[in-house]
UniProtKB/Swiss-Prot annotation:
Component of the acid-insoluble and acid-soluble organic matrix of the aragonitic skeleton (at protein level). Keywords: Calcium, Disulfide bond, EGF-like domain, Membrane, Repeat, Transmembrane, Transmembrane helix. Residues 400-566 form the NIDO domain. It is a single-pass membrane protein. Residues 141-196, 198-253, 255-310 form the TSP type-1 domain. It comes from the Eukaryota. The chain crosses the membrane at residues 1531-1551. Disulfide bonds join C153-C190, C157-C195, C168-C180, C210-C247, C214-C252, C225-C237, C267-C304, C271-C309, C282-C294, C1067-C1075, C1069-C1096, C1098-C1107, C1114-C1127, C1121-C1141, C1144-C1155, C1161-C1173, C1169-C1182, C1285-C1296, C1292-C1305, C1307-C1320, C1326-C1341, C1334-C1350, C1352-C1363. This is Mucin-like protein. PANTHER family: MUCIN 4-RELATED, MUCIN-4. SUPFAM superfamilies: Growth factor receptor domain, TSP-1 type 1 repeat. InterPro entries: AMOP_dom, C8-3_MUC4, cEGF, EGF-like_Ca-bd_dom, EGF-like_dom, EGF-type_Asp/Asn_hydroxyl_site, EGF_Ca-bd_CS, Epithelial_Barrier/Signaling. The lineage of its organism: Eukaryota, Metazoa, Cnidaria, Anthozoa, Hexacorallia.
Amino acid sequence: DTTAGPDTTSAPQPTTPTGLCGFIRRQPLPEDNLNALNFTLSNFTVERWCAREPEFKQFLAQSVSDRCFGNGSCGVESGIPEVFIFPGFPVVNSPLLVRFYVRLQVNSSVSVVLERTVLTSILDRVLENLTAEFGVQFSVDGGFTEWSPFGPCSTSCGPGIQVRFRNCTNPPPINNGSDCVGPRNETRPCNNGSCPIDGNFTQWEIWSGCSVTCGKGVQRRFRSCTKPPPSNGGQDCIGDRLETRECLKPPCPVDGNFTEWGAWSKCSQTCENGTQVRFRSCTNPPPAFGGRDCMGPTNETRACNDGPCPGRLYPHGLLANDNLLPNRDAFSNFCGRINLFNQEIPFFIRRHRRVYICRNGMLKFRRSAIIRYPQRFPGPRNEDFLFRFRNSYIIAPYWLTISDDAFEQPINTSKVFYRIYSKFSRRDRDVLDRANHDVRRFQTSVPQFEAQWVLVVTWLQLYPPTFPGVRLSNSFQVVLITDGQHTFSLFNYPENGIQWSTPTGRLFPNLYPPGSGLPVAGYNAGDRNLPFFNLPNSGTVNIQNIDQMMGNTNLTGVWFFRLEMNSILSLAGKKCNEWSRQRTSRISPTLPPCPCLFGQATLDKRYFVDYNQTVSKRGNGTICAYSLPSGSRRWVQQCCYTDLPSGGKVLSSSPPESGGPYLIALPGSPVISDADGHEFCCSSSQCSLYYRLRPPRSCFGYTLRRRGLIFGDPHFTTLDNTTYTFNGLGEYTIVAIDDEAFEMQARTARTSGRGLGTAFSAAVAKERGTATVEARINQKAGDLEVLIAGKPFNISTITTTGTNIPDGNITLVRDSNGSITALFPSNIAFTFTDVEGTLAIAFEAPDDFKNRTKGLLGTWNDDPSDDFVTPDGTLVPADAAPRRIHYEFGLKWQINASQSLFTYSDLESPSTFVDLSYIPMFIDNITWVNDSFRYEAVKACGNNTQCLFDAAVTEDTSYGINTKKLEDNNNEINKELANFPPKILGPKVINATIGQAIEVKITAEHNSSDFFVFTVNNLPDVIILANTSRYLLIRWTPTSLQKVEPVFIVTDSHNSSSELRPLILLCPCANGSRCIDDEEVSNQRNKGFSFLLLSCTCPAGLTGQYCQHKIDACVENNQPCFPGVKCTDVSSSSNGTRYQCDPCPKGYSGNGSICEDIDECSDANVSKCDHSCINLPGSYVCDCNQGFSLEGDGTSCKDINECLISNDCMQNCTNLPGGRTCSCLDGFQIDPKDQTACVPISRCDTFKVGCQQVCVMDRGQPKCACHKGYSLNADGRTCDDINECTTHRHKCSQICHNLDGSYTCSCQPGFNLSPDQTTCEDIDECGLINEAHCEGSLEICINTMGSFRCECQDGFHRVNDTCQESLPSTNGPTGTTGIVASSVSIALTIKDADLHEWQARLSRMFMDAVAKVVVDYCKGNANGNCYGNAVIAKRYTRSISGTSLVARVHILNDFPETRDANLLVAFYVMLSTNQGEVYVMNKDSLLRALQESQTELSWAIKKEISEIRALKVDDESPTPYETREDGLEMIWLLVGVSVAVAVPLMIVIVILYREYRRIAKQRRKTNNFDLRQWSGARERTIYSGFTNSKSARL
């Protein structure tokens, strides 16, 4: 067995005696035995082995060493291999057996055994060599490894086997060694217990019976896991043990069940007994197949918001500290002006600073004149096709014509109260909170709204013009709320606050058609294409119900509107106002004046120049400088400089570019900064507000600043500009001001080079009340150090805008070149700069310190001769030699320890920096190290002595060049600081008038210049009258309205310039009109405009923006005459108005402008009525007592024979004056329960006699009779029903329904049955509370008998079911394309006519005549082609016959035109049918109709009409708008055009209304009104349900 390993017992035991070879064998350790190897030698004797054993050991040790330490595979980095033979070996067998191991001697005390695997590997590589070396084959037989553990059992259950293994690798056979002998694996039996048995299902059982007897049920069947069941851990069956299937039986009854309650609805009221409703339904499930219904209610109601409502009105009156609009007569013609001062109100795209409160129920923002007679917004069009109120900014909660006399009554006086509430007043908090609450709940888009101010205006007890005859009054309120960005208004109408809309109160409402001066409620934005709004029923009688109507707030009598559009503009205005109200916006403390020149600002150390406009932005070319803050104050002076046309910059002193006091904003502060305040105010027309709080500052008071400099090896430039050199070594007083307790000291140190010069290495300064500021060069690090109060300061924290040192009461500033300046409270500046390791020091002070300085910078008094004064007052001459200046002046200012301000280390004092042996080089005796360096220095310095001196002392020409640069720079600085611009003198405002010459003189002043050059730029049409060295005189004649911005520039002999940019106020007014600086001009001025066109106040008879047109004074004065009274433009009138009103209509008294109704009923001689008299506006009507009718003369009353009309007596009827009486036949008497019925006096047995209804004893004989409502038949016994409806025995005004023995009455749609149960009364749909039928602000609801219609207000017509201004382009149902007005228009000429006549009378006559001709033509030509392009049409073609037709005439824009002495008129016609169709009339048909009726048309207008033709291109107007829409409809539509015409028509209407009110009409109602408010260009109301409503609208 040749194995080697841990099983030592298997190795052959030694058979040779110990020490066979005579060697002493080392006793092996256990680890040696584990790692030993055996090898065999064939044909090798013991003796031979013994002889060569040492050689073997040496060979093997060398092999181990070579292979082990070469690749580090032995586990140690180094060692000495030693081969050991086991004791008793070799064993004498055949072959010879040797056992050995190898140890590695790591050091003297440590050896380790070589692992067997490593030894085997080595031996495998060297055996062949070993064989060759010893001449005999060395072989290693293979050896088994240990047995591995037995593996797992071969089966998981039941009997199995386990296997274990060993390998012949311990070692493997080497060099033909023998393989291992023996098995390589062993097995043994194993058993893991019984095997599991998986379960299996049985067969399914049969299905069970159905689980229910009705409806849907289930059947079931089962199976089990028992074939076989699972055992010994076997798996259970996989699958269902139960199966179900649906089975159907007859349906079962299903009882209904409620769903869950739905959510509660929105509360019906925001306060005071609101309700909420929630619902559920019986659908969970619904009852079915005979099941029971749900038991219980389907809805529930609960109370909500049961708290009391605040009154509809905000606090008002004297108890609310309101102001009372004075009752003076002036306020009957003018509105009271309320100035808002610093506040503004955004109103759509404009902002206003004043509000006009008018006693007749409106607020205005421009012009104080009262508009007496209301008209719906936007008002009618004028002759220029412009709406009347296009320039009127109006809020009208209830604009009406009132009695001015009621303001003078001692009791029940009309009053107008007003008050402004401010956010900044504690007393106003309650009203502000209420306003904020209202805005947030009615306008949810601004949940954080905070009002800045609120205006509350309350009108109380306004009476109609018929006061005191009519004592009904109106009270209402408007609330304006704004935060500066958003504006809202509330219209509040208290309960029973609105009692009248007509002069007759609530009597005879039908006498007042829409538009006849009735109250208007809404608003008008005042600019073309901006919103206007009319409340429902505005301008109609039914506006009087506004206090009972639900407003758009869901509250009765409360309406809410948003009144602005431009949020960006408004936001700026809001922020400007917020800024102005901050406490930080208060007037600033005294601040320094601005430097006069931009160069001074850049050099004055007290100012920071914001080149990049990082602080506050101005216009292009403008740069601002800021004074540095002092101490803890945040106020600084802002100075802004604008570009000059000729180059350079000049101080701006006019908005919006100018500066002013400026408050530095605190980081994170919520307040608005001054920079933002300027931007907000000047972008929202409020620049003046900003500059009122931040007034611009000129350079007046800016004084000369003088700069002294010490630099180089040291050279001094005194404050009187004397330059000398003093290179002492030590510490010296540079400048001292005793009364200000200011002193600056400096320290010198030797310069490099020859050691003959010094330079400043440190400086220190202090003022009374401040810390010391010390600067020094760190000699080790070579950089600049700063100490404040003796402590190092981090200079990286010093900024260019100034770093305040609160504890030191100083400000430090870093320049862009690295210089650091210390600013003291006295405005003294101390600047130090590191120049290549030396300090350059500058002292700068205002000229307040003249005659107060001493020290090495001399005495500042502008006299260089006395600069060298010693501390004891000795004067050294200014021309003294440098040596004398050094010893007799400079060294005298050396300081000692008691005087020093410096900071020293423990071993330092002033004497530390003094060397008594030091003798400097003097500047008058410069010596050079050699000529070549001298030549180099002269080349670099030129003749600059200071430069040459410093180069010679330091042996460095760059040092000298730096000295030269510092000196030159200081000279330039002093020159710039001393340079002041000329003062230009001229007008700041130039008032000019177009076409008129004006002369302007410009002069200048300067204290050191007597020569000036004047120029003027940007001024056309200018004539230079004189241009001398002292003044400029020009003449300017403005010839156009082109903007000019002149700039006057004056330049002095020092090339300094100033400019004057006057504000140009140009008056463009023509025809002697007057220019005014109104709100519009003020807004432009506030924006900083430098050229403004003034507004014009036109004298009577002129109009236009510049009063360039003559106008009708009637138009100018808002049609001042009483409605229906003709207004005539006259050159003059007795009252100076330039218009004249015709006399008041019959029935009125007054001056034609104000007409009061005459009560004819008060004088029986006038009215002559038989019975009673009813007074009407302008007239009266007689009325008769019941039972009488009015005769044709209108005054007499005639008895009505009731027995002939609707006789309701059962038997006999007798007519009486004013009535009738019923009586009975013999045997009957009047029924006490019914005075028209008869009952038997004596009854008999009806059964015996055989009577069907009644048996009566007549003269002792029984007779049959009938009840009321029946008639006795011919058989004398039976009764038949009398049909009262066919026999005219009923009193129904409309529909009669016969009943058995009686009848009932009913009404057609649109009527209600009156309490008498017979009469039908018309429903006024337009007056129904909270039920509007016409949509939008442009429609007016017109009540008709039994129905209503919706009409577009004047100036609009219906297109595509909406009211629009102009002819539409549509793609209607018929597929028509867009319509151009000119393509369907006719032109004709009216001879000998002008525009005045057209406006006064011809327009109405002409359009009425054309409308009549068109209707007659189309009716008479039923099959003709009248209908052209469809605007609103059916899908089929139909005939006109049997159709009501309305024609409307539309005049094109810019027509009529005046041509010679004639008028050219262009127009088209629109046709409306009662079928809801709207057409543009066919042009050919229109032309034919007019040509056939040319004579009729001429007769109708009393002017000759000629040249009727289709509109040609040459005739066309540039824009296809129409000017009006009038038509010939039913005659009553014309009522209200003129009071004079209207009065008799009103009387007829009253009579007809009373006589024929039973006539019914079928009505078609539109959908409910849905209030919409737009903020777009023009309100466009959108309709729904057109198919159901078009007939009613037309």
